[in-house]
Each structure stands twice: as C-alpha cells, then as structure tokens.
Amino acid sequence: MNVPDDLKYADSHEWIRIDGDTGVVGITDHAQAELTDIVFAEPPKPGAKFSAGDVGAVVESVKAASDIYAPVSGEVIEANDALADTPSLINTDPFGEGWLFKMKLSNPGELDALKDSEAYRSHIAL
C-alpha cells in the first residue's frame, strides 16, 4: 500500500498535496483499493467553496458510490477533467493522474488537524 510521505491525510482517506496556498486533493491508495474498479467520478466545479469535511466530489465503483470530502476549507480552482473519460486513473495512479481537484486554501491552519504519512499508516493498520 503506497502512502507518500509528502502528503497530508484525512481520516476519511483523502490526501492533499500542498503548494503554497493551494492544494491538490485525491483519494488514497487504500481508498481506491477498497472501492475496487472506479467507473465514474464527479469532481466539483471550479468556484465551488467548501468547509473542511464538506462533500467535495463523488466516485462510483462497481461496488459502491462514495462521497469524497474536502480535507480543508477553500475554493476549487481546477477539476481533473480527464476523469470524465478515464475514471480508472483513480485506481491506476491515485497520487498522480488520478487527482480529483485543486483548491485555494482559505484556512491553512486546518492542515494541522490532518495526519502525516506515519499517522495515516497507523490509521489503516499498515
């Protein structure tokens, strides 16, 4: 199970990669493995605003539909449009091409409530 050290993780299995005051959000390798084959992804539209913990996106697999939560508060600045045609990118490259959305952080202090890679590994019992 891949858990990159340069990301922050939510208990609900989202990750965020920080670059200044923006972040890229996706779901973890653990989450995509639990969902199995993802057949549909609906990222949020640019301009959408979320508080930490709000539903930000939806993914559907052959097994279930799952809400994806915003790990921090902010405004969506870009959605991964490639997922419309190839939602399986979330399975094959969850930390790269399978990202869901980019957001401008409105409260960077919320990052402190997220887990580092070691704490997330413990959370999923790796």
Regions found by a protein language model. Name each.
Residues 1-55, 88, 92-126:
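Acidic, low-complexity mobile loops and tails
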Residues 18, 61-62, 71, 106:
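A short, compositionally biased micro-patch
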Residues 61-64, 81:
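Short, conserved catalytic or interaction motifs in soluble domains
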